[in-house]
Regions:
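Conserved, mostly hydrophobic/aromatic
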Residues: 6, 18, 57, 65, ...
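Short, acidic/polar
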Residues: 41-57, 116-134, 180-192, 265-269
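Beta/alpha (TIM)-barrel catalytic core signal, keyed to glycine-rich beta->alpha loops juxtaposed to Asp/Glu
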Residues: 47, 145-289
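N-terminal binding-site loop/beta-alpha segment at the start of enzyme catalytic domains
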Residues: 1-93
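Short, well-ordered coil/turn segments that N-cap beta-strands
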Residues: 11-16, 60-64, 87-92, 135-139, ...
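Active-site groove signature of glycoside hydrolases
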Residues: 129-151
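A short, structured active-site edge motif that brings together acidic residues
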Residues: 90-103
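Active-site mouth loops of central-metabolism enzymes
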Residues: 24-48, 108-124, 149-150, 179, ...
């Protein structure tokens, strides 16, 4: 698989990355997620399935892995797998995120699956947790789903703590979601601490159903930031799992294009993301081999 440098960070990444969101917890928003897990939510079973996917990803050449504190046991599974496989830290790039706390207690129908808090105390606590769970495999630490409304991009205490981590060799990123992604990313591009741009990378939702953040990602790339694209398959809504009546005509177009190219709909949609000139890494949320 093609490797490249993530923006100006010097971190080497594969064009495809693997996200741990659907592998680390039993309840997730991907369509038919329960079926992918065969409705077996035993923690040991899920860890074993995560290892199967991680091994397949590694063997396919994937060298970027993305986790978060709110991904259930995702960081633990990833950290354990990296250690058991004795992966050299120089041969892999690992990113994680802070700002959400997992609260579902391994339940599928929990009242709340996560709580968002972008405070200094949360950053300091979750940083320690992430480093420990990932067994030291951590290169990029990202604000999880920053928005212009959350205030985290104006919180000087948080920004200075992130700058301190950066001074110790950790690359700093920000992720975004929702209709205001562009405004969030443009604000992040402008943040400078002690004469240096704070954020080294951005992670945003871009796919064929939601491409609106594209211009902002182009600006971030021009500024030297690494670009990670998430939700390329729109959590399954850009596959034949999407049974919404209004999606039928779009699915037919995708099926026709995929057939003409001799490929699958999944591969076609991922290729559309990979072809964007701003994209360094496109994340897959695979849950089975």
């Amino acid at each position: 698989m093609e490797l490249r440098t993530l923006g100006s960070t010097g971190l080497v990444v594969s064009r495809l990355g693997l996200g741990m969101a659907a592998l680390g917890r039993p309840g997730y928003i991907n369509l038919e997620h329960a079926d992918d897990l065969a409705r077996n939510y035993d923690k040991a079973e899920m860890e074993g399935k995560a290892y199967d996917v991680l091994n397949a990803a590694w063997d396919a050449g994937i060298r970027y892995f993305d986790a978060a504190r709110s991904y259930g046991l995702g960081e633990k599974f990833l950290g354990n797998w990296l250690s058991l496989r004795a992966v050299s830290p120089e041969s892999v790039t690992v990113g994680s995120k802070w700002g959400y706390t997992y609260t579902a207690d391994w339940k599928i129908q929990a009242q709340a699956h996560e709580i968002k808090e972008h405070s200094l105390a949360t950053l300091q606590r979750q940083w320690r947790e992430s480093v420990g769970l990932l067994n030291g495999y951590l290169d990029l630490y990202q604000i999880h789903s920053a928005t212009t409304e959350s205030g985290v991009l104006e919180n000087r205490e948080v920004l200075r703590e992130l700058a301190r981590l950066k001074s110790e060799g950790i690359h700093i990123g920000v992720t975004s979601s929702g209709p205001e992604q562009g405004a969030t990313l443009r604000k992040a591009i402008e943040i400078v601490i002690d004469g240096s741009r704070l954020f080294d990378a951005v992670q945003a939702t871009w796919n064929l159903l939601e491409p609106s953040v594209g211009p902002a990602l182009t600006e971030a790339r021009a500024a030297g930031m690494g670009i990670i694209v998430k939700e390329a398959l729109a959590n399954g809504r850009l596959t034949n799992r999407n049974k919404e009546p209004g999606f039928g005509p779009k699915l037919a177009v995708l099926q026709t294009e995929a057939q003409e190219l001799g490929t699958s709909i999944d591969a076609l949609v991922l290729a559309a993301c990979l072809s964007q000139p701003f994209a360094d890494v496109v994340l897959s949320g695979a849950t089975k081999v």
